[in-house]
């Protein structure tokens, strides 16, 4: 277990902080500690709910890059819920949900590039506009 903890701290660039109390860490470091706690259990699927909300842009990108590295290097599935689309292009696949008739529905599943083509947009940020103005057009039944 000790080796697993050490490897996890190293993979998340937290080795230098291992003796620091959590309340003294930055927001980005606290998020990485949260990820580390889950990784130590060695799950196949890691669920991250709004893992980047409230972070500065640098820390947000770092969390996204760490998530991608974990998925690829450790052969894990990382499921991340986010409303922030700035670094979403780092994801391998996207699941886009929309609200139609007061119920959440699947609108799209695919790569970021496929998302742009499907919604006929030039930036992922535009997905919200499409779904807010024409939700029924994109709901998959």
Residue ranges and their predicted role:
Residues 38-39:
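ABC ATPase C-loop
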Residues 46-49:
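Catalytic Walker B motif of ABC-type/P-loop ATPase nucleotide-binding domains
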């Amino acid at each position: 277990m000790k080796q697993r903890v050490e490897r996890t701290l190293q993979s998340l660039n937290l080795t230098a902080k291992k003796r620091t109390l959590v309340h003294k860490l930055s927001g980005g470091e606290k998020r990485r500690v949260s990820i580390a706690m889950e990784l130590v259990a060695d799950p196949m699927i890691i669920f991250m709910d709004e893992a980047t909300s409230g972070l500065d842009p640098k820390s947000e990108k770092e969390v996204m890059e760490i998530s991608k590295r974990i998925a690829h290097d450790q052969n894990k599935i990382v499921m991340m819920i986010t409303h922030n689309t700035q670094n979403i292009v780092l994801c391998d696949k996207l699941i886009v949900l929309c609200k139609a008739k007061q119920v959440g529905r699947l609108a799209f599943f695919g790569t970021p590039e496929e998302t742009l083509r499907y919604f006929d947009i030039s930036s992922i940020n535009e997905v919200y506009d499409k779904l807010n103005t024409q939700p029924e057009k994109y709901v998959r039944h």
